[in-house]
Curated annotation (Swiss-Prot):
Catalyzed reaction equations: S-ubiquitinyl-[E2 ubiquitin-conjugating enzyme]-L-cysteine + [acceptor protein]-L-lysine = [E2 ubiquitin-conjugating enzyme]-L-cysteine + N(6)-ubiquitinyl-[acceptor protein]-L-lysine
Entry's family note: Belongs to the RING-type zinc finger family. ATL subfamily.
Membrane topology recorded in Swiss-Prot or TrEMBL: Single-pass membrane protein
Family annotation (SMART domains): RING (SM00184)
Gene Ontology molecular function: transferase activity; zinc ion binding
Top EC group: transferase
Start and end residues, zinc fingers (RING-type): 147-189
Protein name: RING-H2 finger protein ATL70
Free-text note regarding domains: The RING-type zinc finger domain mediates binding to an E2 ubiquitin-conjugating enzyme.
């Protein structure tokens, strides 16, 4: 029995010596083919952008376009009206100076006629009918020594004209020019028209008719 056991142990030892020991584990080498795989890694797709067309309906887009069209039309209308008003006003201003000149000319003529009708001077025949006298003959204690129109002193040979009624004396040329523009005496402002007491009736009637004709003209 002991021999059998020993023989069994020997045979087992041989079998163990025949079995080669396991080789040590080899180090793991990095495979360069795995890097492209990492580089080809793609991130997850981003979330889709919101669809604004979905937010604005077809009716809203149509209304927006319609509002833009109306605004452009209103601007064009305002521009047209403004330009038309500008050109019309410019034409009126260009034609107004000639019309203003015509109106002022009419007013001037009308005013001139009114002055002639209201404050006329005396006609030449009436002025020449007033008496002429030398200063040396008319000189007296109450006679003025100078002309009230030109303020020039009288001399003995100066020819003067005497107005009727007031009997004021003036230089001939001074009083004739005055009476062509004014029908009154420059000193007392009375009318120098002759009266029936100082002038014969034959001279008064033609004189009155000439004055009336002058006023009517």
């Amino acid at each position: 029995m002991l021999q059998f056991t020993l023989s069994y142990i020997k045979s087992l030892t041989k079998n163990l010596s025949i079995i080669s020991p396991l080789p040590p584990p080899k180090p793991i080498k990095q495979n360069h083919q795995t890097k492209p795989a990492m580089n080809n890694f793609q991130p997850p797709p981003p979330s889709e952008m919101p669809d604004y067309n979905g937010l604005l309906g077809t009716d809203d887009i149509g209304g927006f376009r319609y509002g833009i069209g109306v605004s452009i039309g209103v601007l064009l209308l305002i521009t047209t009206i403004t330009l038309t008003s500008y050109y019309c006003t410019r034409n009126q201003l260009s034609s107004s100076p000639s019309q203003t000149n015509q109106d002022s000319t009419r007013i001037h003529h009308h005013h001139h006629h009114v002055i002639i009708d209201v404050v006329p001077g005396l006609d030449e025949d009436t002025i020449q009918s007033y008496p002429k006298i030398l200063y040396s003959e008319a000189k007296g204690p109450t006679t003025a020594s100078c002309c009230a129109i030109c303020l020039g002193d009288y001399k003995g040979k100066h020819l003067l004209r005497q107005l009727p009624d007031c009997n004021h004396l003036f230089h001939l040329k001074c009083i004739d020019t005055w009476l062509r523009l004014n029908p009154t005496c420059p000193v007392c402002r009375t009318s120098p028209l002759p009266t029936p007491l100082s002038t014969p009736l034959a001279e008064v009637v033609p004189l009155a008719s000439s004055v009336a004709a002058t006023r009517m003209s």
